[in-house]
Amino acid sequence: MSRLSLVLILVAGLFATALAGPATFADKNPIRQVVFPDELENGILQVVGQTRSALSFARFAIRHRKRYDSVEEIKQRFEIFLDNLKMIRSHNRKGLSYKLGINEFTDLTWDEFRKHKLGASQNCSATTKGNLKLTNVVLPETKDWRKDGIVSPVKAQGKCGSCWTFSTTGALEAAYAQAFGKGISLSEQQLVDCAGAFNNFGCNGGLPSQAFEYIKFNGGLDTEEAYPYTGKNGICKFSQANIGVKVISSVNITLGAEYELKYAVALVRPVSVAFEVVKGFKQYKSGVYASTECGDTPMDVNHAVLAVGYGVENGTPYWLIKNSWGADWGEDGYFKMEMGKNMCGVATCASYPIVA
């Protein structure tokens, strides 16, 4: 093996170990004293070259605490990063209503991303006729429930297709704050581990509407503190002593009825929704998202989120939606989606709970 190969392997090893965080080093370990972000940056550049794109990749890897196990993986991830960067730049030159940008998913292929981040069950058993009761009232031009203080902080689902659990807890946390005047964090992990009998599949997908039915039948949902998130399928550990919220019933929006969804978001509270994520969406950065590539049927939707408001940007009406990919993604963990066309099926599988 050449000396250069040995150096590159050492660089890769230092890179992976250092990004694991200081807790992985003993204080007496001399490596901890010399490995800093600028040194890691230089180490990556030794592997992938000295181009501007290589520098972007090095800084991306450091910012997002990436862990690569070998020189070969660094090279592979750099190539994927370049492909995504090319797509980002090509899109942003078109002057469309939304921008793409580098985020923690830029070193992932679409197949890798889809495996770990999408999880709303297809064929969501949407309600042909919902049970929301409408009245003759003029809806406000804009709404943002964050301003009312009932929307809980953005969470991150990790490498688990549990988006449906975060949509569920987001709706419940908002309903709880609205009803009782204080915040609460509820257990996604209980839904992952315990709600399988209600046509949910843990890290392999599920639906908020079915989760509401499970919680109603089960008698409640534990708090996050009592039943913390692991991001893996596990054995059910529900404890009645740790219940944070109970569900009395839920309200379903008629399939594809955006006015009903708008009515509920405007006058009731945040609503769990699902839509189809297609390839470019993972790099969303800002603006009003729209796509001609996504579908809008119950068989198309693959990601559950939480509609927390709506508005108008540059003349385009939009939904304001809370995601579960962390606060560094999109607009502080949120995105805007074009309203009025049932874009990507946003009003296809919508529901919200009534809590006690």
Swiss-Prot record:
Q: Which residues form the signal peptide?
A: 1-16
Residues annotated as glycosylated are 123, 252
The catalytic site is made up of 163, 303, 323
Q: Which domain of life is it from?
A: Eukaryota
Q: Which family does it belong to?
A: Belongs to the peptidase C1 family.
The record, for Gene3D superfamilies, names: Cysteine proteinases
Q: Give the CDD domains listed for this entry.
A: Peptidase_C1A
> What is the species listed in this Swiss-Prot or TrEMBL entry?
Solanum lycopersicum
Show the GO cellular component annotation of the record: extracellular space; lysosome
Glycoprotein in keyword set: yes
Mark which residues the record calls propeptide: 17-138
State the protein's name: Cysteine proteinase 3
Q: What is its main location?
A: other
User: Which cysteines form disulfides?
Assistant: 160-203, 194-236, 294-344
